[in-house]
């Protein structure tokens, strides 16, 4: 198993709310969550793994993430953990108002749930109606009479009484219908009422990540609770406020949404969309964090936004409740209830679509209040370096340093080169990608890296018509025409100008970037450098030669019947007898150029080919450094001649040489200051090896006996490094003024991180001028080629 292989581990989605009557179950999907089969599987798995977990001292199985940091469950002693079920029920008070109700250990919680399940399934009425011990009676204090705490005042005894009355009302039905009804009232073997109590935390634990693990099943979500004034979200204070808005004493601006929240304020106080997962133990942290970051948090914020603006969630809850009553009156049972709700409730349909898409690694396109929202866990099909041979990855993955362009945006998920290299952390994907529900848009990092995307092109991963149909776009819409205009040989900047002039579309660079980001996020396009016959391409080390080669040979032959076969075409690009050459060397004539470029795009799409990029470092030889040192010495000597020592200074030096009483002074503050200045002065370069004394009358220049020096960042060169560079330009290479201009454009790319191909795209430098400059300074650069 590997982080590069998608594994959502999603079992189902469960929606619960909290009203003045307490926690309530609204909808769950899929229907298989409520079945005797899953219940028996849960109990069997619990019996098989209980001893194993105790012997191996497994980490805490139940945790609740609060707003700041995760808290450890160390509150129970070893003696308390060894209590039997009966002792636990008699000595421990399980009050939903108490924080220990949510912070218990796995064994305590399962003992409680299993005992209640046995009691509920018991056939004897006397056993069901047996009085509870005084320790389990509800304890209600005056401190917890606030509206927020009233939502969680159901204790174990109250839940048991409700079950007893429910079982007594259904005692006249036959045994088959009773068992079916019991299956409908549980989720993975847990009673819905108990899960509602667990999954409706106090308000202090809402509006933040909530995670609890019960019997290897993870219940994770983002519970959303309304504020004291009934609003569901708050904004920071802005310059201009609308009429009717209220500013609190702490500087927060609350929206006056009395029209939409007056009803829900008195009824629904919290809603919680819970995702139920069963991830592998080794990948537990990573899979849960991945699901929460990409899907759960964003979907919860969207629902909060719609609830705040349009009271959407509460209206759907009332509709679902009414639909359940209508269905039971018409059918007499719950057969087909899920399908009935999905067909008539947009929220139920969104939950269903979300589960089916995410569990299949697809993109969930949800219509939330008639607005299209897309959610997904990005699949790792792009790598910036070659993974280890033992690290699994998806066939046809793309290998290129170009993927670093979107590494921090959250639009793509770069693959891991080592097994479990991220150690369960999403630190590389979480920054730079945030979903602001108040702004109702997906915001990406607007730094210089994402600005460079206009110099790149898009490679469509599917047929344009299929993409337009899949994203539900109108055929004549702006994005549809943009998709039809995409060519892998043209940059987005050129495409924007083309749309403005020829297609008569008012498309600016920002809109083109937005379209490109959406296509990348929807997995319909890939960012690449524009394909060119002058570039060098090789067979990718990650080419799917052992997976899809035979099928792709047929597909390549069907798409390009006039071209050589796929193996022969790949041999043209990476012949073992010669170095890689420009792609133009493989094209027979100009008439074949277009079809060969299309074939190159096809190979790039399926991961068979990658582009070789050229990276350059600027090298400073020892000869250059010695010449610069001589120039500095001559400059220092000239300064001495132009500024001779005055008689007073000469007399002072003689006095210091003959007067022994001043020896302590000469060895004291002045020399100490000189040494301190020299020590504290920042070096020009770690490899410069030159130190200059701050005393103008005693300049010491020291040249360390080292070899050549590579300047790591010429764009931010120090004064000494600039002298080295000028010595190369004007004395060693003697560049013409035109070449000097090209050199300074080229200088900031000599860091080994930015390729020369990017220089050609951004700085408007011709290949001829670049080749001429490279030939002139070839003795002072180090160049390498890789993907």
From Swiss-Prot:
Keywords: Meiosis, Signal. Residues 157-179 have a biased composition (Low complexity). Residues 69-85 have a biased composition (Acidic residues). It holds the Pfam family NPR3. The keyword Signal applies. InterPro entries: HTH_NPRL3 (IPR056603), Npr3 (IPR005365). Residues 25-89, 121-182, 233-262, 661-693 are annotated as: Disordered. One of its GO terms (biological process) is cellular response to amino acid starvation. Residues 1-21 form the signal peptide. Residues 139-154 have a biased composition (Polar residues). One of its GO terms (cellular component) is GATOR1 complex. The keyword Signal applies. Mediates inactivation of the TORC1 complex in response to amino acid starvation. Required for meiotic nuclear division. Belongs to the NPR3 family. This is Nitrogen permease regulator 3. It comes from Meyerozyma guilliermondii (strain ATCC 6260 / CBS 566 / DSM 6381 / JCM 1539 / NBRC 10279 / NRRL Y-324) (Yeast). The lineage of its organism: Eukaryota, Fungi, Dikarya, Ascomycota, Saccharomycotina.
